[in-house]
């Protein structure tokens, strides 16, 4: 059965309840519960560890399938060619859905030819602006400030980019996980659906959820720390180097080649900017105004 909405251009077929979908239709994605799995044997294809990443996770590959282990979250089995994602049974449904729309979904939309980047995306006047940077670069706090200013959040941390025929962002899950101190200061709109030791988990509804249609990409902003709010255009060759470091790719030759060609298309077609700003709440209004301005620069 269809779950009644889309995420990253996929329309899930599942009996599970999914709360972060956006209205629309898309490509079929099978999602079901995984009864149990035998842990893969051998070295992981890739591993993520704190503090550079919020969770400890390992990704394995066996023939056409991937197996993702997440600490305190169980196993996910992903078959991108189908596409199909099997999620763990008996775990917290909120955490499970949040993790479903991370690496498992990424593996499926990469198979489709889309490009993943480590960045948030916000819609401003009908166009998307990508906010890129490593963990702890202030992406989520800036995204929360833009949300509070009335701009729709397309995705909070993992962006799905379609490079051709013209670059566009496919909206991800309608959610935002905000640090507790940022939530208290900014009070962004959204229904609180969960809390943990570090974050408030918000679900976006109404106009701030919007639909799942692709949004034309107008600008990519590389977030930098500075004493002043300022920006400058980045030459395509320099932007390619920075975006390569922020791209989410596997240590496989075909995946690296796919990623490189997608980023070349992106840097040739979309303005890339360095956005320098102080990481203070007092400067956020000026930063929000600068983001909106850069989204309108041809």
Where are these regions (language model features)?
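Conserved lysine of the Walker
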Residues: 139
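Glycine-rich, often acidic-flanked micro-motifs
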Residues: 1-24, 120, 124-134, 148-298
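Short charge-dense sequence patches
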Residues: 46-61, 91-96, 206-213, 234-244
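Post-Walker A alpha-helix
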Residues: 142-143
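Extreme N-terminal, non-catalytic leader segments
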Residues: 69-127
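A short linear-motif detector with a strong N-terminal bias
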Residues: 9-13, 45-48, 55-57, 63-65, ...
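Long, basic/Gly/Ser/Thr-rich N-terminal segments
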Residues: 1-90, 291-298
């Amino acid at each position: 059965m269809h779950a009644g909405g889309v995420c990253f251009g996929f329309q899930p077929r599942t009996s599970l309840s999914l709360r972060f979908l956006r209205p629309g239709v898309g490509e079929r994605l099978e999602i079901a519960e995984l009864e149990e799995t035998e842990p893969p044997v051998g070295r992981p294809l890739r591993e993520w560890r704190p503090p550079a990443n919020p969770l400890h996770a390992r990704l394995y590959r066996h023939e056409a399938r991937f197996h993702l282990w997440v600490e305190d979250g169980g196993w996910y089995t992903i078959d991108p060619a189908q596409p199909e994602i099997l999620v763990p049974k008996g775990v917290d449904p909120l955490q499970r859905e949040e993790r479903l729309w991370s690496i498992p979904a990424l593996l499926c939309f990469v198979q489709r030819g889309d490009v993943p980047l480590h960045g948030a995306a916000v819609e401003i006047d009908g166009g998307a602006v990508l906010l890129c940077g490593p963990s702890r670069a202030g992406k989520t706090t800036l995204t929360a400030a833009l949300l509070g200013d009335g701009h729709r959040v397309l995705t909070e941390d993992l962006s799905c980019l379609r490079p051709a025929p013209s670059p566009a962002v496919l909206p991800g899950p309608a959610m935002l996980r905000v640090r507790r101190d940022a939530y208290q200061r900014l009070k962004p709109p959204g229904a609180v659906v969960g809390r943990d030791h570090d974050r408030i988990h918000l679900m976006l509804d109404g106009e701030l959820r919007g639909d799942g249609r692709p949004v034309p990409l107008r600008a990519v902003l590389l977030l930098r720390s500075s004493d002043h709010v300022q920006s400058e255009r980045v030459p395509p060759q320099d932007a390619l180097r920075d975006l390569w470091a922020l791209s989410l790719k596997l240590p496989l030759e075909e995946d690296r080649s796919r990623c490189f060609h997608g980023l070349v298309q992106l840097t040739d077609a979309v303005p890339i900017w360095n956005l320098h700003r102080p990481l203070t709440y007092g400067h956020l209004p000026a930063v929000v105004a600068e983001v909106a301005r850069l989204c309108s620069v041809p």
